Amino acid sequence: MVPKKSAEPKLTVAELGRWRLVEQFQKRLAASAVGRAEHRSFADPKRQLQLGEYLGLFLFGLLNPAVRTMRALCAASDLARLQKEVCGRAVSLGSFSEAQAVVDPQLLEKVFTDLAQEGQEAKPGRAGGLPWRIVDSTLWEALPRMHWALWRRQGPTQSAVRLHVGLHVLDDQVDRAQITTGRGCERRTWRASWKPGEAYIGDRYYGEDYQLFGELGALGCAFVLRLREQASFEVEEELPLSAADEQAHVIRQAWVHLGCKKRYRSIRVRLVWVQTPKEVLLLVTNQEVATLSADLVAQLYRQRWQVELFFRWIKCILGCRHWLAESPQGVAIQIYLALIAALLLQRHLGRRPTQRMWERLELYLLGVATLEELEAGLARETARLERQAKTKKV
């Protein structure tokens, strides 16, 4: 069943400047919290900082270019406008820090999931008639004192947090997310998220366990995964190439079995060799040629750059390089809020903001740019992107 399209009105540039995004988030939070049990401390009459106020202030800190630390955020809560629109009262360091221990990150995960599903629509033109999703993960460096996030010991001890995502190719939108420590296995996390009938695109690490291919096939899932150059395989049948395949720089395709030993052998899969300026890519899929031609296999894998751009954007533009909370719950809260902010911005601007768009928004929020200059800057950047897209099509 296709989710109904949201009737929520599109925000104007001026409304973005008035932090209507925080207001929209708080409304969605309240809707998602219905029927869920809150921590008992929120029922205590002595508690002044409520759930929506805490998370709204946290989100404000992620979005605002002038706020980089928890101390700065709490100091800003003294401002009358911020109290009126976001947090209701001045918030002390102790109250803000303590709140992370009583907020369930699964509530934010639900807000994120509901928001992502709300924006998905059935669209024509899916390759092979399948909803392709790019899977990948990225690391955030954690502070040495965040011992729970121990990642590895290469020289000094290193701590990190890993975000695993699934990015819907046609919507260019992350609709799945899972947070683990840096040691969290990418394949294990991906496997836990499988759903029958879905289609996945992944890099080399996801293609290292050949036994997963049979499990994916049993679920009715399709995949396009990259293999390492050293992959061992036995050719069962060479396949011809079409003119479209050759135009997509496909140099060979064949049905093969992967694995050098019988116990490691994969099911029969189709291996596609794609020539790039630097190297030859080995791409594997379980789809028949009639369902997914070799040129489409190459084109699908090239879409992986979308998830890399998303990681760069959420880290650099949303400012997720500074931890406003350091516990496992606090870190999960910060990352889920960043993901929610990314979806809200993408929804209300009609696209994921580029770095130039985000810089202009920040200048406006700092009072350097006027509303007219903000609107003109966003219009120029949008026009540039449209011209760029037309040039690529030609």
Locations of regions flagged by a protein language model:
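Single, function-defining residue in the core of a domain
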Residues: 1-72, 89, 100-103, 110-111, ...
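DNA-recognition alpha helix
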Residues: 68-86
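Short acidic (Asp/Glu) patches
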Residues: 82, 117, 146-152, 183-184
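Catalytic micro-motifs at enzyme active sites that drive phosphoryl/nucleotidyl and oxygen chemistry
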Residues: 84, 121-122, 152-154, 212-213
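Short, basic alpha-helical nucleic acid-contact segments in DNA-binding proteins
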Residues: 95-120
